[in-house]
């Protein structure tokens, strides 16, 4: 062992074979045209599989930018990806005129209070892929036994100037402890009963109810036919009745189930595939779950769904049955229940989604999100197969501003594809190459 008793130089040998040097991390960035995903928003992607999960698969019309991103991820593990869409792009919606919702921030700003007038749901992102979605929501009326689907007049009777109809209670239960009696109105033709309109299909029936027609006439009779139970009832372990939070507040019938289906197979490859489902959510705006997190169905769908946004409350409800959806559960309210068909008349197929390729200005706007080096860490900026004006924009307005990132601009496809032996000459002589700003970045 060496000792130093006075100032001098001490020489030591150290084995560095067990030292693993730190590897510099490179972060890529790209703005482009992708099939799916949030638009004009930076999303960190870590792998090729992750790229497909967030932005969809490449298609025959949308593949250049996906391939560039995929190639980078074959070597790197961090790619900041921005999807941009054209002005004509639209999210698929339940009904009405489709809207464009680029990302969650714009949703919160413009549609979170139900301003869209497009029905209860919209696809999470713009594009035709959203047209494959079907959304169903069920409460106790559609997931608890059968409901009255139709009536048949078996005898028109005579002498009626006014008539009423009553339905017997669900077999074996009473409205207070397990079912709701159906209701309806009678239409006359002359002095005869012509038809019965169901105003509330009820629920909890195991056999068809008995119909009794009253009024100032006589001899009119009718029968009821039950409709099929909710198609997706078996996807859930329990009937949506009342949540614990609502029960503690004295409220009832606030619970709903929501399920999202790939109706056409365009997403999963198999029509009818269940994409996601949410059990035991609440109609109450103040609802909390067992972990004290929001359980209001609107909030849960917006925060956790990968496929849809809430856009409005359903209109097919029995308005006379209780408080509106979105009310507080305080004060022991009974919430309105769904009405209409066996599925609560809330099976919604989304449509009117539109794909639209981004224009040059859209792509420039996307790359502009990389300009602030204090907010975004990026080292390598990929231009893909964009117009010369986009590459120039990246150089002048991103790289030259940041001064810490390199820009990678690909040659024009015509210069390198089917041009064997002349690639370098074509690249150097191309007018596009000469048009770019000269920069050390």
Locate each region found by the language model.
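A glycine- and small-residue-enriched flexible loop/hinge signal that marks low-structured segments
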Residues: 1-145, 225-441
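Conserved, function-critical positions that sit in or immediately flank catalytic
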Residues: 145-228
